[in-house]
């Protein structure tokens, strides 16, 4: 267990919460709060890191098989998702449908966690709107075992990521403003590179975790990573939103995550506090 990452999850969860508070009070309608959606990128990158941390060696050494992995992960998603979906359907939560058949299409898409693949807000935000992130997680879990052979030699995985990243940046440039969210923010396919970043970070972590890094050096690394993140965060308003939804934050999020995963500095000690880990 890497306690610092557990504490970081709480911090970024607060940021995501703050990004939605502008609908409650206009005081939150500022760049500082609304940019908190970076927490989504952090969670997807973290997911790739943690899944690799917990399962990469087990799958590689055949201690568990693909089926057992899929059952274990998917079982964590669907029961609660279906419960909230049915409650949302009963309460009549947000869904735009022209009739019964259209309503059923929306419902089935949400039921099977395929709604986020359809780049229309009335689909990916229908019923329980945060479920789009579960669509992404489902894809991550399905694909992860097949990425293990690439992870054995991280250069292959890095090459795949590099090609995908270039294609993404080009695609983002040509995407109309009103289609950005559907194609680049909620779509599991285009959020998959976030997960790969996390997997790559785990390969780096494996090579660095036993390095002799002093508390002073670790603290400098952590402070530097925080400064880098703040620079990206505070000056993000000058960057087109399509990039900020994903690739713009890969570097600062990756640096934050790898710096604190090593648990070598003073800030890691603070984040390892039992209270912070619990919350």
For the regions a protein language model found, what residue spans apply to each?
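Hydrophobic transmembrane alpha-helices
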Residues: 49-57, 84, 88, 140, ...
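Aromatic-anchored segments of alpha-helical transmembrane domains
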Residues: 14-22, 90, 116, 163-175, ...
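Solvent-exposed interhelical
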Residues: 138-166, 202-221
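Interfacial loop-to-helix transition and helix-capping segments at the boundaries
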Residues: 2-3, 28-40, 122-136, 175-197, ...
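Functionally critical transmembrane alpha-helices in membrane proteins and complexes, commonly lining
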Residues: 2-57, 77-84, 105, 109-115, ...
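Membrane-helix interface segments
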Residues: 61-66, 78, 103-104, 153-158, ...
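Transmembrane alpha-helical segments and their boundary/interface "anchor" motifs
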Residues: 37-40, 44, 57-93, 101-110, ...
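Alpha-helical transmembrane segments of multi-pass integral membrane proteins
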Residues: 94, 195, 221-279
């Amino acid at each position: 267990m890497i306690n610092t990452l557990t504490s970081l999850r709480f911090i970024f969860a607060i940021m995501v919460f703050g990004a939605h508070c502008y609908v409650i009070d206009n005081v939150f309608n500022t760049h500082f709060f609304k940019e908190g959606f970076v927490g989504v990128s952090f969670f997807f990158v973290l997911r790739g890191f943690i899944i690799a941390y917990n399962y990469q060696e087990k799958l590689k050494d055949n201690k568990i098989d693909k089926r057992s992995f899929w059952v274990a992960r998917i079982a964590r998603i669907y029961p609660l998702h279906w419960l909230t979906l049915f409650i949302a359907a009963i309460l009549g939560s947000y869904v735009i449908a022209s009739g019964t058949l259209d309503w059923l299409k929306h419902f089935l898409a949400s039921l099977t966690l395929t709604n986020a693949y359809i780049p229309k807000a009335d689909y990916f935000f229908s019923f329980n709107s945060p479920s789009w992130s579960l669509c992404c997680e489902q894809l991550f879990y399905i694909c992860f075992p097949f990425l293990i052979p690439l992870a054995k030699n991280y250069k292959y995985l890095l090459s795949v990521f590099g090609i995908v990243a270039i294609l993404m940046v080009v695609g983002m440039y040509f995407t109309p403003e009103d289609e950005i969210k559907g194609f680049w923010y909620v779509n599991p396919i285009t959020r998959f590179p976030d997960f790969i970043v996390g997997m790559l970070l785990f390969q780096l972590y494996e090579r660095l975790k036993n390095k002799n890094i002093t508390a002073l050096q670790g603290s400098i690394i952590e402070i530097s990573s925080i400064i880098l993140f703040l620079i990206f965060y505070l000056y993000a308003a000058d960057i087109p939103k399509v990039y900020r939804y994903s690739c713009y934050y890969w570097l600062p999020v990756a640096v934050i995550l790898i710096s604190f995963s090593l648990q070598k500095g003073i800030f890691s000690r603070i984040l390892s506090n039992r209270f912070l880990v619990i919350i």
